[in-house]
Amino acid sequence: MSLASSLVVSSNVELSPSSFGFLDSVRDGPQIPDSFRFSSRNRVPNLINKKQKWGNHSHSTELKYPILHESGYGSVIVASMVANPAGEIAVSAEQKVYNVVMKQAALVKRQLRTAGELDVKPDIVLPGTLSLLNEAYDRCGEVCAEYAKTFYLGTMLMTPERQKAIWAIYVWCRRTDELVDGPNASHITPTALDRWEARLEELFQGRPFDMLDAALADTVTKFPVDIQPFKDMIEGMRMDLRKSRYKNFDELYLYCYYVAGTVGLMSVPVMGIAPESQASTESVYNAALALGIANQAPPNILRDVGEDARRGRIYLPQDELAQAGLSDEDIFAGRVTDKWRNFMKNQIKRARMFFDEAEKGVLELNKASRWPVWASLLLYRQILDEIEANDYDNFTKRAYVSKAKKILALPMAYGRALLGPS
């Protein structure tokens, strides 16, 4: 395994410690300081060109989501492709996501072939650089501890290098989400997101903008993390700016991948696959995708129906609402009827299928990484339980997991984390 390139930092560099003081820079355009540059290794190619026209592609049954092929769920995701009126090939959401998963898995498999095992790459650093990086990672840890307390506690069992890398990824994702959901969301435009993506590309080339970027720039030199899931998350933010309805689950699934499934793909290269795992790399990444979606999209979407409606947004499949005899007006009115309860039961059932799929993959992760993942899975599952306990009123009641239940989840998650691949 080759050594990572040296990290060079000027002695007079000044990095802002602010967690989220980046909105002005995004609006005005990135101003990357030359004094803080990570030498680029250019290891990771841009794996997916969104404008590429895909040819016929067959899916292995091992890699398919059985949960997406159950009957009775309206718009089933399939891998078929249909020509649109312009003569171009229209690709299903599953097809698009599948290609990203396969590319990420291939990247890690190449790493495994060259290194024998997936491990952290050692760095040669200048003395002043190390203290700055430690400060950057510490700040990421503080942000994670403040906004994701239970997950942060779970990371305490991870090795220091993996722990810091996960913190850096978490902070970047949070900052990205804040662009469209934070207090300054009304000022964010598509151009601002383009600038944020340009800043991401600079980061992956070893040119971070600020302290928190520096932590992630260091992380991507140590682990085989691909830029595409990060770009796809930004694409999810673009969807939030231009789209407030989803006509079927295929559309919604693609959105869920962008804003949540990407997190699973970002994290697995850092968390690592258990040495004793007999599962294929592709199947582990397939489960990682389900993990990211399960931990974020369905619970949050179903919990926040009322809140989203007050913002004029409906993150539910329009065709399935119609099949249930419901309309946008019913949601805006916040009526909890039998039709709504039956609709929600089906949505929760599908969400739990994502959790079931994700749990299969957790067993294949590196032992030290399983605890925070199990903690998140158990807690987000309970959001669905709380929606049921509220009699499916997610218009006026916000389902949340009590502090006591969060504390109880930690030892349970730890116990499950001890179980490895069968």
Swiss-Prot record:
GO cellular component, one term: chloroplast
Subcellular location: Plastid, Chloroplast
Keyword Transit peptide: yes
A biological-process GO annotation: carotenoid biosynthetic process
Involved pathway(s): Carotenoid biosynthesis; phytoene biosynthesis; all-trans-phytoene from geranylgeranyl diphosphate: step 1/1
GO MF, one annotated term: geranylgeranyl diphosphate synthase activity
Enzyme Commission designation: 2.5.1.32
InterPro entries tied to this protein: Isoprenoid_synthase_dom_sf (IPR008949), Squ/phyt_synthse (IPR002060), Squalene/phytoene_synthase_CS (IPR019845), Trans_IPPS_bact-type (IPR044843), Trans_IPPS_HH (IPR033904)
UniProt transit peptide range: 1-83
Keywords noted in UniProt: Carotenoid biosynthesis, Chloroplast, Isoprene biosynthesis, Plastid, Transferase, Transit peptide
SUPFAM superfamilies noted in UniProt: Terpenoid synthases
Self-association and partners: Monomer.
Annotated PANTHER family: BIFUNCTIONAL LYCOPENE CYCLASE/PHYTOENE SYNTHASE
UniProt function note: Catalyzes the reaction from prephytoene diphosphate to phytoene.
Family label: Belongs to the phytoene/squalene synthase family.
Protein name: Phytoene synthase, chloroplastic
UniProt lineage: Eukaryota, Viridiplantae, Streptophyta, Embryophyta, Tracheophyta
Gene name of this polypeptide: PSY
